[in-house]
Amino acid sequence: MKRILIVGAGGQIGSELTTYLRKIYGNDNVVATDVRECKQLAESGPFEVMNALDANAMAEMVSRQKIDSIFNLVALLSAVGEAKPQTAWQVNIGALMNSLEVARQYNCALFTPSSIGAFGPSSPKDKTPQDTVMRPTTMYGVCKVTGEMLGDYYHSRFGVDTRSVRFPGLISNVTLPGGGTTDYAVEIYYEAIRSGRFTCPVPGDVYMDMMYMPDALRACVELMEADPTKLVHRNSFNIASMSFTPEIIYAEIKKRLPDFTMDYDVDPVKKAIAESWPNSLD
């Protein structure tokens, strides 16, 4: 990777990945874009406002900036996707299709993340294997499975260098998430410090896979730098770090903050989503 375009740089992953890539490849070689202004990203390197649903704008950007690698991070997350399923499809798949087409036209490598949300209730719950039944019950999951298949199609049909991992919930001390089912695993730490109490929106006994953000960023770079001839899978690799429940986090925080309390106000949508996902990935 020499000239990198990040599409959706203002989100949870993109905001930190931009900084991470700039440290490795140089500030001027990582072009960040988002549909909204991102002052912090603009201060450290090239940033432009761009709507990922505008195919012509993306093509012009790649051509003008001489991009060789694209990171498409545009997504409406799981809970938001259930509230706005049509919008989620239009945004998630629209941005991906534009990225794939531009990558095909300009011979770019393309990274676009999948998720544990690609699995569903009929997938094995524990140590979910790489290749298994994938019948998600959320629009977010449907988009992720579709994205994996489109990535495979563009690689086999057009030779596009597509790559992807299935991210679990991502835990960051830098950027707050928004609209996801695993958000509680970040919010609980902030509330523990801010107010000493937390109201959890998912049941206390539900396991979900999680990963610390710096590990996720490193995985992105290692995959994109890997020898393409040695990649068994392209869309998409399982990637795992840890699996826990809200009660497990609560107990660990209590060891540091004995006065910390947690209660529950379970969101039925998030509950259904969480219970449809794997407990752990293989």
Please identify what each model-predicted range represents.
Residues I4-I24:
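N-terminal Rossmann NAD(P)H-binding glycine-rich loop of SDR-like oxidoreductase domains
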Residues V7, T33, I70-V74, L110-I116, ...:
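SDR active-site strand-loop-helix element
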Residues M50-L53, A83, T87-N98, M134, ...:
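Glycine-rich NAD(P)-binding loop of the Rossmann-fold in SDR/ketoreductase-type enzymes
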Residues A52-V91:
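NAD(P)H-binding glycine-rich loop region in Rossmannoid oxidoreductase-like domains
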Residues W89, T132, T137-E148, G178-V186, ...:
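Short-chain dehydrogenase/reductase
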Residues M97-M139:
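Conserved Rossmann-fold NAD(P)-dependent oxidoreductase catalytic core, especially the SDR/UDP-sugar
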Residues D152-Y207, M213-L217:
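NAD(P)-dependent short-chain dehydrogenase/reductase
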Residues P201-P203, D209-D282:
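C-terminal substrate-binding subdomain of Rossmann-fold SDR/epimerase-dehydratase oxidoreductases
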